[in-house]
């Protein structure tokens, strides 16, 4: 290692063998004039043809300098590459506007016996509001990049000793793949001190045929803990409980079981954790497992006007790096150069310092949804910020492939939103009328779309919230079965294999654009109201009027029908939504009564939940839920 490059922050990494072009663009950009495609013999080396140009202005290899400027003690970073052949390395940076600035360039000539080491130090001072740094390689002869990386100029403070926690539920193959990836790279393997797997399913990870090999590489570091299905919050709470009680690990890394891991992401969040000015949560970003070049979001916040998660200012959902590269003049790409500050990070990849976990306590008993947001907000109240670090990411199933806004998860969305709002919603915008108004709007939309089961379980969500924090903990395991029982009585919650299971629709589908003109919106709304005041035609409950694709199932179409099939978000089945005037009015009145109670009692519930936070987040309280597993010896790999 050179005198300048003292501690690795981020390696240059290359695509896996056989990756498609759109995924390759997350790692490198090749000039269209190159005679042949660059080849990566390993994950950290690249063979480039003669008279070619390759840019590392990419998601995984550009350096997010503004984040390191804002959150760490680093004053500068060093690019260090080892190359053979003849060519040139040019270093560029950007401003927060996306404007590109040349930094410096170096010609190089290296041989197999003596590779050339090219180093460039980049001062971080100009990156207050945004900006990245990257390098390009232009070749004269064939060139091999043997290694490259971004380095700090001083040794990393603290200790690298991570407890990785992967709760799993009936995904043994996915979990085994994640375990295998943890030991696939020596640098990643050596920083992992423990791997904790709470197994909450019936199909056990240890029964998978590939488990013994994956477990053998982890050895005594791996522990499997069987426990009831307590959801993600119960799984992650077990991870934190075991990490604090039975390890000396200084970092706790939460990860989902159903992800595809980029192992270097672990090293990158660890590096930021170690160089951070003060303890903080460091999270990775999420790429779309089905469209791998698509980034879910640069970062998220909680909208304090309605207390709902949303994109952070200047961040947009679903950015496609294959279509809009980082170094692109498109307005969408320019937004990527701003530093995005967040309220929380999803627990698909999130590193929590041991010190923070010891001070804040356990996650809330929310089963799923909002537990990650709560912890980020709770940390901020204790002076611990959260950063969502670009270039550190995993691939996860996109939310667009799920019906979680209308299926059983809708219960947890609303109930837990209310719980977390009661815990953390303060300031001039903390007026529950905004939240209730947004819920009323959503309720009317659900009823117009014949999503009666959604309204029914959301009514239960309000009831359970108003019943108080002790009740919330008591139903940690039982709430989901109760929600399933409620949904079974509504046709819109019964999934059929295909629309062909029913008689053919009475009408062919017609294209309907969303209304934007206020007069047209008013007309469609009036038609829908008048239609819903009349009794439904029983014939349309035996034979649907339309077969509606999921993307077309909007209020302005469904509010004037009595029966229609709607395809599920994953495309694997349909539900037969049927209008029922009596049921609709009953659900509406029940919802309105509960919303009135929310308005009346929210201040009271705010005090009750805040008083209960120390108990809800305590190890002692969580032991009562984890007791069946706590009385067992964990199984080690």
Curated annotation (Swiss-Prot):
A Gene Ontology BP annotation from the UniProt entry: mycolate cell wall layer assembly
UniProt-listed Enzyme Commission number(s): 2.4.1.288
Pathway(s) annotated for this protein in UniProt: Cell wall biogenesis; cell wall polysaccharide biosynthesis
Pfam families on file: GlfT2_domain3, Glft2_N, Glyco_tranf_2_3
Keyword flag tRNA-binding: no
GO CC, alphabetical: cytosol; plasma membrane
Family: Belongs to the glycosyltransferase 2 family.
Subunit structure: Homotetramer.
Protein name: Galactofuranosyltransferase GlfT2
Gene source species: Mycobacterium tuberculosis (strain ATCC 25618 / H37Rv)
Taxonomic lineage of the native organism: Bacteria, Bacillati, Actinomycetota, Actinomycetes, Mycobacteriales
